[in-house]
Amino acid sequence: MKRKTMIRTFACFLLAGGLAMLSGSCSSDDGNGGAPMIESVAAAADANLEPITVGYAANMYVIHGSGFSTTQKIYFNDTDTYFNPNLVTDTDIFVTIDRDTPYADVSNKLRVVTKTGEAEFDFIVAPPAPGVHSFNPINAADGQEITIYGSYFLNPTVTVGGNTATVVSSTLTEIHAILPAGSQNKKVTVTTISGSAEYGTAVGTAIYDDVFYSPWDIESWNNHVYVTDLSKAAQGTTFIKKSIEGWGNIQGNWNWNDQLSGYTGIHFFLRSDDPGKLVWIVNGNGWGNDTHAITTTKDWKEVRLTWAQLGNPAALQNISFQEFTGSTHNYYLDNIGFTVD
């Protein structure tokens, strides 16, 4: 079948609503009783039906070839895939890849089984684009190993500021990689066959990720605790929790860092078990100031503050937070550090 005929066929499928067998010009190809043969696969949404060898779950594709009129089964990576027999002619099959089709450690094959035989075709079902949850340690030195947490890490490559990192090992949810030279203040990107994801916190910018970096700390008299739970952390595996009474606070220690020229400001992540409000205080400025108030929910919220918003301080000396609803809430802090953009 010519490509323009395939396009016309697809249009006829749409007009028919997939509810009846094609007729007339939409079913001009008659079965010949021979064994099936797959010639190409194309995305159904592509008006030009350009041949491809990589597809994605929950998307429809056109299998083009011959001998399909008695199709009984379709398999992607040996997964039995539902198809509508009303969307089958002798030369074309419209089928949607099942969303649960596996993509790791699989055959990378498409198979069509008919009454007269079976056809096989090299075809990759790719995972969704990767997602980067976080990495640790943020303040790793060049040449040090980091652990990247996330999802859909199928055969990943890792770059830091455009420089290639050495992947030591990987699973679908975790990558161990060695930072290349020149990684400081650069961002980590994970790339797979399905796309790329860049993590927003740059290497070497942490005040707190899973631990505080000297000289910073929250002193024990604050009565806070550290919770280790990767599934609930904003960054890494461990975050800070404190039940703060109305108008109470959690205070960072006082110190001095005037090496700020490489940064554009600071950021931190906040959340609470129920709706709350915290006022941020930097270098002692902001107590009781409602213009510094941040509403919190059960979802992590990143707050980014530029040096201009902070009054262009000569040094960073302290970061603290004041409860601002007047009631007691459980508050959580994570990923406190400097920004580079």
Regions flagged by a language model, labelled:
Residues 99-106, 179-185, 311-313:
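Surface-exposed, short loops/turns at beta-strand junctions within beta-sandwich domains
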Residues 226-249:
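Short carbohydrate-recognition loop motifs
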Residues 212, 254-276, 303-305, 336:
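Extra-cytoplasmic beta-strand recognition segments
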Residues 268, 302-337:
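Extracellular beta-strand ligand-recognition surfaces/modules
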Residues 104-115, 185-194, 317-321:
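Short, aromatic- and glycine-rich surface loops/edge beta-strands on solvent-exposed regions
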Residues 27-69, 116-155, 185, 194-220:
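Beta-strand/beta-sandwich contexts
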